[in-house]
Amino acid sequence: MSEVLFREAVTRGNTRMKIATIETFDLTCPLNRPFGWSQGWIDQRGTTLVKITTDNGLAGWGEGAESSIINHLLGPLLIGANPMDRAGLWEHMFHALYNGNNAVGLAGSALSALDIALWDLAGKAANLPICTLLGGKIRDKVAVYATGLYYTEGEFPDRLLDEARSYVEQGFTGMKTKVGGLSIEEDVARVKALRDAIGPDVSLMIDANEGYNATTAIRIGKKLQDLDLVWFEEPVNAQDLEAYLEVKAALPMAIAGGENLRTRYEFKPYLARRAYDIVQPDIMHCGGLTEMARICALANACGIQVNPHVWGSPVMIAATLHLTATLPPCPPARNAQPYLQEPVMEFDRTPSAIRDEVCAVPFDQVDSFAKVPQGAGLGIEIDEEAVRRMS
């Protein structure tokens, strides 16, 4: 979209509005069947939503994982400001965290939540979808893969393999499972059974959630290398750059990571040294739409594909779809394909009332593609009754 058209759009609306209130909602929902991965076991899901309301009644929604930093540090910085000044407000919030290197961890997630809400507000003020504000779409729908196949009690083999087959029946062309929560022998048997169940034509990925050191990651990777795995995600500690380089040099499948990094400054050495084949920034942790767009540009310049990490409510799903719709193929290709040049987005299928009930119309996929929302801002309708019920 041209700058002239954007200015015309916002001039028709609410360019002089000010931020009046900021509310946070810490959401939780129980799980009927607990599940786990290499780092934990949960019996409930949770996230934090933020609602920014202006003096003219317009509201924008964001998502992160921390309410106290929003309520007591970053939120007060925004009261009275014009939400259209997104870049300046991002820098203002980042500067408040900069001196102590506090833009990592939960503070980075708080910054992300507020930034997403500001983009939602800007889109609603201009009556334009966020992807248009970002420069316009390259694609109307985004390729997605099913995330599920976690560890559950008594899952193997029947329940696990039935779950995998159900994703194929739903039209998914790819899916991801966990490793690192069992012995190497047990995890290898689990992944081999999954490959046999879904056949050779469905993309299969594994995710260790930082569960190994480099030596062990290489060991299990070599045991699985004949299964045509598309990628091995977070094989080692997210902060161990040298371990990533060691694993990447030793294994034939692509190495993926980045969901636990914050801001372009943490991503920079991993991208510059090509520690990843695939980078997976998380929009509700890495700095929101503003910062994730910068990270994606860095990755593309380094020839590293961006396949975003997504595990939250419809707010982060919508935000990620809008940004992913604008990402160029990596590298450019006449007939770009998912997994090869086109970005592929995570599509969480684990149980979550938050994901399924917070939005009036939950997101779905058809033939392993999810449509980019067309409405103003995030393009979704939040069910505030459901939000308040779960908070």
What function would you assign to each model-found segment?
Residues M1-R16:
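N-terminal amphipathic/basic-hydrophobic helices that include classical n-h-c signal peptides
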Residues N14-A59, P351-D356:
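Structured beta-strand/loop patches that form or line metal/cofactor-binding pockets in enzymes
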Residues I19, G57, L74, L114, ...:
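Conserved, mostly hydrophobic/aromatic
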Residues I52-A125:
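Metal- or metallocofactor-binding catalytic centers and their adjacent structured scaffolds
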Residues E63, L111, V179-S183, N209-E210, ...:
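Glycine- and other small-residue-rich loops at beta-strand/loop junctions that grip anionic moieties
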Residues H72, K222, D228, Q239-A256, ...:
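Shared catalytic-loop signature of beta/alpha-barrel
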Residues G135, D140-L251:
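Metal-dependent enolase-superfamily TIM-barrel catalytic cores that perform enediolate-based chemistry
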Residues P373-S391:
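Extended hydrophobic packing segments that form well-structured cores
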